[in-house]
Regions:
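C-terminal motif of bacterial Sec signal peptides marking the signal peptidase cleavage site
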Residues: 14-17
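Sec-dependent signal peptide recognition
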Residues: 2-9
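Oxidative protein folding and maturation machinery
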Residues: 20-154
Length: 154
């Protein structure tokens, strides 16, 4: 009799366990690329626009997406790193004043994201990327001028 009760209890536990929802998984989003306004015609103006506004959608404080060891504001960290390297390349196409404005813009917006959500890793990720790409002596993109603009924001 006790064996029958035991089997019924185990079967009930298994049936109850099967009915639970699985933890919801978040699918990484593509990087939110910017669209160049149609009024911008010259390549230089386009480079300046991209340099300054490249991160606008990514660092929008209203953007509420998961951030963890693999995701930054919903975007895969690897994808974000590639976009960061691309952005450094764009900075090389503009004058120093524009690059300073672009760097200031990025880090001010990342700081706003961090203040809005202390669990966010947006600011920390950009901090790591600045060290890796702008400051590291082994980086082919190393640029002390860019890093100084970034460090001045800290």
């Amino acid at each position: 009799m006790s064996k029958r009760i035991y089997i019924i209890l185990v079967a009930a536990a298994v049936a109850a366990g099967c009915g639970q929802k699985k933890a919801e998984r978040f699918t990484a989003l593509p990087f939110p690329d910017i669209t160049l306004p149609s009024m911008i015609q010259s390549q230089q103006d386009a480079a300046e626009y991209y340099a300054v506004h490249y991160w606008d959608k990514m660092t929008d404080p209203e953007r509420a997406y998961p951030s963890d060891s693999l995701l930054v504001s919903g975007v895969r960290k690897d994808d974000l790193e590639q976009k960061y390297a691309n952005w450094i390349g764009v900075l090389d196409l503009v004058d120093l004043k524009t690059s300073e404005k672009a760097i200031k813009n990025l880090y001010d917006k990342a700081l706003v994201c961090e203040k809005k959500d202390g669990a966010s890793n947006v600011f920390e990720t950009f901090e790591e990327l600045a060290d890796k790409y702008m400051y590291n002596v082994n980086s082919p993109m190393r640029n002390e001028e860019y890093y100084l603009h970034y460090a001045a924001r800290l």
